[in-house]
């Protein structure tokens, strides 16, 4: 392919990016429909559609002329601005990586994941791991094979980690998790010996229609533009974005738990705030969306925990909670509510875990993923290994696979290597808070008096607007300096020492 000017080649690159974004939009709408409102036995027809779309997107991603566009631009980088240079860099990585995957395997994997999502949801509902196991076996095998395609000279699990956080590897994570354990385990031991916090009122009967009203209220508190972001209901909460003007978050409701959906909405709201804050200039390009999953989780965990579980936030929303649920919260004051939503104790469900024990849930999944990809753990043995690790890490027995290895949707979606992002994101958020406090003062303490606007503006300026322009490590260091997990361990120590009067 011949180009008369560099700008002509750049225009061709951006036309390709826009086309890929359009197909991604279509696939995303299909996925959203599948996980929210589609009848459970509709996966077969949808699978055919996904197969056709996957074939088209593979062909578009790997066309020889696209490689020529990239090569031409690589030889004329001095004529490009910084954004265009970054687009070329990302396009090269994506082009080379996709071309290494045989077309038939790429398409078959898309079909497999469509089926696996439906089978997983049914298996979870029926507490039937055996029905999901064959799909998980194929997903693990495919990820192991694709890891070799993506980064032939890299360890397979390290390769998968890099799909979610560039530059991440097992050594970094092993050291990080060791550092967390040194603080979390002894601190949890002290907490368990302290006077327990009464949170029984959070588990009374909370009508779902009232919880939906509460979710809408939380969206208002987070100052989310409902003309560009809405809430749907699904088995496992998640957020998806089609561009920075169209973001969808999902949640689930349990009549016997107020906090479950409350914190799902705030967590997913954090993801949504990030996507809505990306600069318009990156729309429909390969730089659209969040910088990485760890940076993304830093935003969701920041709003869920640092904001949403703070006393000022609880004080701000408590009148509305009392208004909606007067009988359930009779005799409960704001201090009791704040302490209850922060109660630390070993538990079964990751998404409902407290701040202190949450990373132990992530470590369990990390250890299992390493073994699955290395081939030292067989899929048939996943339930037993899951249960063993929960006994070892949290000292609890797992009664059912529904509450154990079937609780998360990630593996059915092929996202092996994602889980560490939650722990890294939590630590990133604590360091961001320290920098924010240094620059702005106590924004959390003044959250009802303009603090929410200030912290959102700070995150928007320093993190959100940049989308994928910077690599995740570069973005973080520009804002916070060198990553140091001690900010997170100090945050946990201070919070739970005060909360439990240790």
Which residues does each PLM region occupy?
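Active-site recognition of the HExxH zinc-binding catalytic motif
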Residues: 13, 151, 260-279, 297-301
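C-terminal, non-catalytic "cap/extension" segments appended to globular domains
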Residues: 2-9, 25-31, 35, 41, ...
């Amino acid at each position: 392919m011949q180009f008369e000017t560099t700008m002509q080649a750049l225009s061709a690159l951006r036309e390709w990016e826009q086309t890929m974004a359009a197909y991604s939009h279509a696939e995303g709408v299909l996925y959203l429909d599948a996980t929210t409102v589609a009848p459970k036995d509709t996966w077969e027809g949808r699978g055919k559609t996904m197969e056709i779309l996957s074939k088209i997107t593979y062909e578009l991603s790997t066309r020889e002329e696209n490689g020529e566009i990239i090569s031409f631009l690589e030889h004329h980088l001095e004529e490009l601005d910084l954004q265009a240079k970054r687009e070329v860099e990302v396009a090269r990585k994506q082009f080379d990586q996709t071309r290494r995957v045989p077309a038939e395997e790429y398409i078959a994997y898309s079909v497999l994941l469509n089926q696996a999502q439906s089978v997983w949801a049914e298996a979870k509902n029926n507490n039937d791991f055996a029905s999901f196991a064959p799909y998980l076996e194929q997903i693990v095998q495919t990820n192991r094979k694709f890891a070799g395609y993506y980064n032939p000279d890299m360890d397979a699990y390290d390769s998968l980690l890099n799909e979610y956080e560039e530059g991440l590897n097992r050594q970094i994570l092993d050291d990080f998790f060791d550092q967390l354990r040194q603080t979390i385990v002894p601190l949890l031991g002290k907490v368990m010996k302290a006077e327990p916090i009464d949170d029984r009122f959070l588990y009374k009967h909370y009508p779902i229609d009232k919880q939906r009203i509460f979710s809408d209220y939380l969206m208002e508190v987070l100052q989310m533009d409902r003309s560009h972001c809405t809430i749907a209901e699904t088995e496992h909460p998640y957020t998806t974005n089609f561009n920075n003007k169209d973001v969808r978050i999902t949640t689930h409701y349990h009549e016997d738990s107020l906090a479950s959906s409350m914190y799902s909405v705030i967590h997913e709201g954090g993801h949504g705030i990030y996507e809505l804050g990306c600069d318009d200039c990156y729309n429909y390009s390969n730089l659209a969306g969040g910088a990485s999953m760890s940076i993304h989780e830093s935003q969701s965990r920041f709003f869920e925990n640092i904001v949403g579980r703070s006393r000022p936030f609880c004080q701000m929303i408590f009148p509305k909670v009392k208004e909606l649920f007067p009988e359930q919260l009779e005799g409960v004051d704001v201090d009791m509510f704040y302490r209850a939503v922060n109660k630390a104790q070993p538990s079964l469900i990751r998404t409902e875990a407290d701040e202190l024990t949450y990373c132990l849930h992530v470590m369990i999944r990390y250890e299992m993923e390493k073994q699955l990809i290395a081939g030292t753990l067989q899929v048939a043995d996943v339930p037993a290994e899951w249960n063993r690790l929960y006994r070892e890490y949290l000292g609890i027995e797992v009664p059912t696979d529904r509450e154990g290895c079937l609780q998360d949707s990630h593996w059915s979606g092929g996202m092996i290597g994602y889980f560490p992002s939650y722990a890294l994101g939590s630590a990133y958020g604590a360091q961001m808070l320290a920098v924010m406090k240094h620059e702005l003062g106590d924004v959390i303490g003044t959250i009802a008096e303009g603090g929410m606007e200030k912290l959102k503006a700070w995150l928007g300026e320093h993190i959100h607007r940049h989308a994928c322009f910077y690599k995740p490590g570069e973005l973080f260091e520009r804002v916070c300096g060198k990553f140091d997990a001690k900010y997170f361990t100090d945050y946990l120590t201070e919070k739970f020492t005060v909360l439990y009067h240790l």
